[in-house]
Amino acid sequence: MNANMLKGRLREKAMTQADLAPQVGLSLSRFNAKLNETGGAEFSLSEVRAIKRVLDLDQEQTEQIFFS
């Protein structure tokens, strides 16, 4: 996962992790754990889809952030 790219997209959209987390259905602490892959935590496919929608990511951006 490319956390820096995701954080950059958040900045482009003038959003914070605290703004995005509830829109994905996560608490801020759980979102951060998944963002930092703490303890092997990963975003689920439904969470990736929600992030893609909220941040208006295209397919290439989504793949670069979550699957590279």
Regions found by a protein language model. Give the residues of each.
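Key DNA-contacting residues within the recognition helix of helix-turn-helix
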Residues: 7, 32-33, 63
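Short amphipathic recognition helices of helix-turn-helix/homeodomain-type DNA-binding modules
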Residues: 61-68
